[in-house]
Amino acid sequence: MTQQSIADRADRLWCRLRLDRLAGGRQADYVIREDMLAHPATVRSFRRIRWLLVAETVVGLAAIVVAILLTRAGETIPWAVWFRATVVLLITLTLYVFAWRAQLGYYWAYQRLRLFSRIFPIVTLIIAAIPGLYPFWMVIEQIVFSVLMIGIGDVLTSDHMRSAFPKPAKREAP
């Protein structure tokens, strides 16, 4: 089974379950033009986003591994560290879904990814600044996570990506 056939099957299942409607609301059916989706700059942008998400996954997994190793060495790891490490991985999984749907041209997914790439770094850095909440290594992990998210936001707000994903026209009320 090829990677493309797996992607096609996943897309068909996603559409059959009407998850775009659930996640995208009234803009669920709005898809950008095919020529903009296939544009080399769009393809390049999504390749960068995928690599940044892979890096975020590595950072999240590294945080869990460090916590496990420190626990095995006899250190007490605060619950906030375990919670944060788990949440980072779950957030990253949702970002993969948004990136996948945006790469297929769904405006709602592009907007969600863009929104989260703005909000998560701010929240993460504010929480990292709370004295004593996390050990130093976890504060560094949060800073790295934020920098990666800012990178995703930077790619998504480039002139090309904003022109590739124009806002949908307002619908007339019935």
Predicted regions located by residue number:
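Topology signature of small-to-medium multi-pass alpha-helical membrane proteins
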Residues: 2-174
